Each structure stands twice: as structure tokens, then as C-alpha cells.
Regions:
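A general structural signal for well-ordered alpha-helical packing
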Residues: 30-33, 50, 78
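Inter-motif core of Ras-like GTPase G domains
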Residues: 48-71, 87-92
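Flexible beta-alpha connector loops of hexameric P-loop NTPases
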Residues: 6-9, 37-46, 68-75, 105
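Hydrophobic residues in beta-strands of the RecA-like P-loop NTPase core, especially within AAA+ ATPase
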Residues: 33-34, 67, 101
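C-terminal-of-GTPase-core extension/linker across diverse P-loop GTPases
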Residues: 15, 72, 76-79, 83-170
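Short secondary-structure boundary/capping elements
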Residues: 16, 45-49, 111
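Switch I (G2) and immediately adjacent beta-strands of P-loop GTPase domains
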Residues: 12-43, 59-62
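Short, small-residue-biased leader/transition segments that mark boundaries at the very start
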Residues: 1-3
Length: 170
């Protein structure tokens, strides 16, 4: 995986202050990903530049939620985002989503499994655990994103009545 954009990364909350776009390259395919700053409670009312950030979310085909597994309350963190999306525009919560627990290298398996169970109780069907430090499950996640985008493109093409045309080269 290669993302050429190098947004600021640090070990404190809200490092991302502006949306960043990056192109992900994997398996001879590519897609654009938007890194949107974290939403806080009240974002739908404009708190923490919420309207501006949520406006960017509206233009995304799908959502990738990154939740810090070291958080004291994973359930609250997840529900805060979902509630803010719904309060801003109910169609946002209907977008396809992938839920990811980050910093999995920083916790024991017991904590990771507990976090996954908490999310499954909220009807989250699949939860990925990744580590940006070790690279654990990053490639697997990118391939899952590719599959999600591909399936969404097929649905859009079918709704538009478009036929899949194989590529042509002279």
C-alpha cells in the first residue's frame, strides 16, 4: 500500500485539523481516501468545525471509522460518531461502513476481544483490528476497502443502467 500524501501524525487527539486526500495503491488498483478530522459531540451543530467536516463526509461513498482501542469507552466513541452523522443527515448513517480498531499493538488480546464484543452488541457485524506501527492487518483492510468500493461502483453502474465495458487498448 502506498499513500504519497503525508498528513501530520502524532500521539494526541485531533492531530488532523483539515481533511486530507490520499491515493491508495494496492494490487495494481487505486482509490482515493479522505482523512476527515475526528467528529466530536455537537459536530452536527457546528462544534469543532463539525459542519465543515460533515460536509466532506457527505461526498464520500463509504465510511471507514477508526476507533482507538485504548479508549476507556469504545461504545461511547462509536455511538457519538453515529449519532452525529444521523443528526446532521440521516442518509450519512446509511452509507456503507467499515469499523476499525486502531493501536491493537498497544493492548492485550483480551482488551481487543472485549472491544470487538462491545461493538457487536451495537449490531456492528465486522470489526477490523489494525496496528499502524507494526502494519498488522493493513493490507487486509485495504483489500476490504477495495472490495467495498468495487461493489458500490457496480451497484451505481446498475442503477444508472450502464454496462461493464472491458478496457480497450490499441
Amino acid at each position: 500500500m502506498c499513500i504519497r500524501d503525508r498528513p501530520k501524525i502524532a500521539d494526541y487527539p485531533f492531530t488532523t485539523l483539515h481533511p486530507n486526500l490520499g491515493v491508495v495503491h494496492q494490487d495494481n488498483k487505486e482509490f482515493v481516501i479522505a482523512d476527515i478530522p475526528g467528529l466530536i459531540e455537537g459536530a452536527h451543530e457546528g462544534s469543532g468545525l463539525g459542519h465543515r467536516f460533515l460536509g466532506h463526509v457527505e461526498r464520500c461513498k463509504g465510511l471507514l471509522h477508526l476507533i482507538d482501542v485504548t479508549s476507556e469507552n469504545i461504545k461511547r466513541d462509536y455511538l457519538t460518531i453515529i449519532r452525529e452523522l444521523e443528526a446532521y443527515d440521516t442518509s450519512l448513517s446509511e452509507k456503507k461502513q467499515i469499523i476499525v480498531l486502531t493501536k491493537c499493538d498497544a493492548v492485550k488480546d483480551q482488551k481487543l476481544n472485549f472491544a470487538k464484543e462491545q461493538l457487536k452488541k451495537l449490531n456492528v457485524k465486522k470489526v477490523f483490528g489494525i496496528s499502524s506501527v507494526s502494519g498488522e492487518n493493513i493490507t487486509k483492510l485495504v483489500r476490504q476497502l477495495q472490495d467495498l468500493i468495487s461493489s458500490m461502483n457496480k451497484i451505481e453502474d446498475n442503477q444508472d443502467g450502464l454496462e461493464k465495458v472491458s478496457s480497450w487498448s490499441p
